[in-house]
Amino acid sequence: MNAIADVQSSRDLRNLPINQVGIKDLRFPITLKTAEGTQSTVARLTMTVYLPAEQKGTHMSRFVALMEQHTEVLDFAQLHRLTAEMVALLDSRAGKISVSFPFFRKKTAPVSGIRSLLDYDVSLTGEMKDGAYGHSMKVMIPVTSLCPCSKEISQYGAHNQRSHVTVSLTSDAEVGIEEVIDYVETQASCQLYGLLKRPDEKYVTEKAYENPKFVEDMVRDVATSLIADKRIKSFVVESENFESIHNHSAYAYIAYP
């Protein structure tokens, strides 16, 4: 029986290294460690490694094989282990794993007390280079914003809208997804809820009216909360307000430090 050729392991003569090569958008079921225990969800993974100039190709099947071997609950410690194992398995000096997924949180309506789920977009990234490891987290939190100028100049009412506040951070110690959500929702004109009754709708409408925020206010207030958390080394806060009186969004961005 003839041996099957291993083309990707052959030598490449163009002398060009590749910064990242691997697989993108692998859908895979995962179990997350959360503040309340665990949560099952479906993630999209991007897994890449550095490829030296002399090597023609990476071993694509090994990325999927690695995930098939691991069913442990995912947290930052497990992401570190996965990233290190991937780099070793692909015989590389650097690699990155990004795991993106919907995260669900049970929320209680402010008046009726009725419970419902709200979803948030989350990405966890682990990166290793020459033995040094770092991780980051990105969370998109939908909230309500109400315009202070509209409130000030109008005899009644004020324009309000849904906003997406996105926090990307690096930290020395693990920061929970729920903690990031709380930092943002506390600073919004009002939180969002999956299910509201009429008394709840009255409450959130009035709460937003009494707590107006420009897009500038939103990013500054969230940034102030994040700076106070000494576990957090660096962050980016973005807010996009989907303006109800315009066909464009208002946008603000703060990077720290």
UniProtKB/Swiss-Prot annotation:
It comes from the Bacteria. Pathway: Cofactor biosynthesis; 7,8-dihydroneopterin triphosphate biosynthesis; 7,8-dihydroneopterin triphosphate from GTP: step 1/1. Coiled coil: none annotated. GO terms for biological process: tetrahydrofolate biosynthetic process. InterPro entries: GTP_cyclohydrolase_FolE2, GTP_cyclohydrolase_FolE2/MptA. The record marks C147 as: May be catalytically important. It is an enzyme of class 3 (hydrolase). Keywords: Hydrolase. Its EC number is 3.5.4.16. It catalyses: GTP + H2O = 7,8-dihydroneopterin 3'-triphosphate + formate + H(+). GO terms for molecular function: GTP cyclohydrolase I activity. Converts GTP to 7,8-dihydroneopterin triphosphate. Belongs to the GTP cyclohydrolase IV family. This is GTP cyclohydrolase FolE2. It comes from Neisseria gonorrhoeae (strain ATCC 700825 / FA 1090).
